[in-house]
Regions:
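Short, Lys/Arg-enriched N-terminal segments with co-localized hydrophobic residues
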Residues: 1-6
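N-terminal hydrophobic targeting signals that begin at the initiator methionine
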Residues: 7-8, 23
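Basic side chains
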Residues: 8-9, 146
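Alpha-helix initiation and N-capping motif
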Residues: 9-10, 122
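N-terminal leader/targeting pre-sequences
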Residues: 22-177
Length: 177
């Protein structure tokens, strides 16, 4: 009957809406981590922790193996593929909004374009900052499954990607508890 078909369609639509709402709620992660591995014969290692705080993400970076008192471009890249030793399998900068390359505090920049890490006399970095150009997961420029990359040189803000050189450390951004 027509009434039965209408009820079946309504029932199917209700189930679909329920499943979609459950899926979107379960994929909102609050914490993530990337464990860095060396690239291009560097000695870089460390961790990058991400914690969602309303519209900002708190980023905590602990890195060793950099040159003493040096600047290193630091970005989120498109893919979580870090199979290649040169890090190029991670793709280019993550740029879902199509902005030109820029450094913080510029608002219109690549998502997760963090500027530079600055190492101490021992080649270490231990820093925390916030960023509002992405989210860990959800609809606003999600970064779960992408890669974080440390470059060999300073990001000078130039086009198209800051002239930061080779990729000397990288890790996949994964879900943390």
């Amino acid at each position: 009957s027509i009434r039965g078909q209408a009820m079946n369609k309504l029932y199917s639509l209700s189930i679909f809406i329920f499943l979609v709402s459950c899926q979107s709620q379960s994929n909102i992660y609050q914490k993530a981590v990337a464990v860095l591995q060396p690239g291009n014969e560097s000695n870089v290692k460390g961790t990058v922790f991400f914690e969602q705080d309303k519209s900002n993400v708190i980023v905590t970076v602990t890195v060793s193996g950099l040159n003493s008192n040096s600047y290193h471009g630091f970005h989120i890249h498109e893919f979580g593929d870090i199979r290649s030793k040169d890090g190029k399998s991670a793709g280019g900068h993550y740029n879902p909004d199509g902005h030109p390359h820029a450094l913080p505090p510029e608002k219109k920049r690549h998502a997760g374009s963090f500027g530079n890490l600055i190492s101490d006399i021992n080649g270490n970095v231990d820093t925390t900052f916030t960023d509002d150009t992405f989210s860990i997961s959800g609809e606003f420029n999600p970064v779960i499954g992408r890669a974080v990359v440390i470059h060999a040189k300073r990001d000078d803000g130039g086009q198209p990607t800051g002239n930061a050189g080779s990729r000397i450390g990288f890790g996949v951004i994964g879900i943390a508890n």
